[in-house]
Amino acid sequence: MFSTKQVVLSSLLFISSIYTSNVNGKNLSVFGAFFGSPNDNDNAREHCCSPRNKFHLTSFSSGCDLQKEVECLRAECKKSKECCNVVSLCSGLSECEYVEKTCDAIKQYYQKQAINTDVKITLVLKWIYKCMNTTSRAKLAVFTAHAIFNTSAFACLEAEGTWKYRSRGLLAIQGEKNYGLLTSYSRNRENFKECPHRLADLNCDVISVTVDWWYRNVGKCCKDYFGSLEILKPTEWTALKKNCADRESARRLENRRRLYEILVRCYE
């Protein structure tokens, strides 16, 4: 006769064998797809994406020999021409999701009905997604909220005035020091210090160097939206910190926060 302990142990081993399969010589657990394991790495946990199922993947590729299917979140595999053999569930956004959901957020905030047909906005969002090089909903939401609010949905990229180093670009970057940093980050050796007006150009190279500036000066120091305000110091935030905010500053600060919250809801 088997003891109760032996019966329980045998049952657990049996269940484990059902929910675990071998892929490319590596044991892969369905539960591990949800929760991960200490042996996981970022590449191993990349999201599967079937070319036949652009938005949802309800069945795995032939290389994913699993006994039970797990509903995948929408995301694109980094290997564009093949589905990864390791199944995982990520909470990130694919490029398609990011663009679609961000356009929805812009439409909600600005109350524009035809925002999804705006080719310019779609193209800029694709550039932002590629340059950000992350699928993190949280990171994308913070950066995108500031970029959209600062530029009125990419329509205004330069502040009024005559100061050479006035606010420009997606993040309303200003000051001679910051323009010098942008120059040092530029992969194309663009001299933003000598030609600061270039920061108001809306192209992939400018977005790339702007994202570099973000990661080096904001992203590494803050963990959330309010932390980013402390570093970016938009005029309305600075006025609030100095206890000299007027009604307009308060309104702008509230609108900036509201846009961020709309993005967060759309990304859920």
UniProtKB/Swiss-Prot annotation:
Keywords: Glycoprotein, Signal, Sporulation. One of its GO terms (cellular component) is spore wall. Its main location: other. It is found in: Spore wall. Glycans are attached at N27, N133, N150. Residues 1-25 form the signal peptide. A motif (HBM) lies at residues 77-82. The keyword Glycoprotein applies. GO terms for biological process: sporulation resulting in formation of a cellular spore. Heparin-binding motifs (HBMs) are characterized by an XBBXBX or XBBBXXBX sequence, where X is any neutral amino acid and B is a positively charged basic amino acid, and are defined as the consensus sequence necessary for protein-heparin interactions. This is Spore wall protein 25. The lineage of its organism: Eukaryota, Fungi, Fungi incertae sedis, Microsporidia, Nosematidae. The gene is SWP25.
